[in-house]
Amino acid sequence: GNAVGETASVTADGTGWEGWNRRMMSFVSHINRQDWTETYGLNVVVEGTRAPLSTTEIGSYMSRLPKDTSETRKNIIRYALQSVGKVPYYWGGKASAQNYTGNNFGSVTLPDHKGRILKGLDCSGWVNWVYWSVTGTHLPYEGTEGLRTLGRQVRRQDLKPGDIVVITGSTPHVIMFLGFTSNGQIQCVHE
């Protein structure tokens, strides 16, 4: 699923279990440790969708944007943050339509290379979908390599909120730049 920096799997109480009591947490942990194939004959795939960000969390991220951030960039970032936890990660997944309607996110589909079965988006598909949904313009490339050739390289200090960052190497990835943390680490929104 989508994530914001390192905080995506942590809810307001700091544990990732907001609203759960110890008995329920223990029960869920027990069930997750079971071998479902051996015990029940079921092949269970753990999906990577996280809890959506709260309105307060989204507001907090938005309030940290530089004052000169354009309305379009603000809308792109807000939409990206609002999608956290709502779109499953699915390798090779691309959007069929702008916004949520027509994409059937979360419906069962053929397994991807890691066995994920819920329809969703991969990192480059997610970035393209966010931009398409907000601006009405479908980026000319949907894959990581295509997005790399689409843009131009900028220096780290010249990154602006909403910029697409393509990470190359043996495990390529696409993220949306949000800002820098107080210790200079990149904070991003990603699939």
What are these regions, as identified by a protein language model?
Residues 25-26:
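Alpha-solenoid helical-repeat scaffold
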